[in-house]
UniProtKB/Swiss-Prot annotation:
One of its GO terms (biological process) is coenzyme A biosynthetic process. It comes from the Bacteria. This is Phosphopantetheine adenylyltransferase. One of its GO terms (cellular component) is cytoplasm. Homohexamer.
Amino acid sequence: MTTRAIYPGTFDPITNGHLDIITRAASMFDELILAVAASPHKKTMFSLDERVALAQQAAAHLQNVSVTGFSDLMANFAQAQQGNVLVRGLRTAGDFEYEMQLAHMNRHLMPTLESVFLMPSKEWSFISSSLVKEVARHQGDVSHFLPAHVHQALLEKLR
């Protein structure tokens, strides 16, 4: 049986912390779908199409990773994609509480959908897209936390 995992997120923008999780998840599962959420309730810096394109370029070196945008309920999206595992990153205890609620709801909606939680490597454990954007807005150097093409796109957005 092929294990098709889905790693959903807003990825606004995709960071090296996300890539850490993506790379490790790609080595664990037959296929990994990087699902970029439309997130209409969030005020994103990058459009959905831009976030998908940035993620595609960031993950291009991983043969078993595909990238797609979505706006559906996660359980419905997973079912449509024939996904059987959700991958989520955990940085803090607060992340765990929220992710546990989501995992239980997703399991209720799609009983065959498992949630797997990965902790980022220590180097990326404090990174979030929001923090990176905030530091960049104040002219802080965030190049270490982003793939080079994403860093360039962020600088262009902030001009």
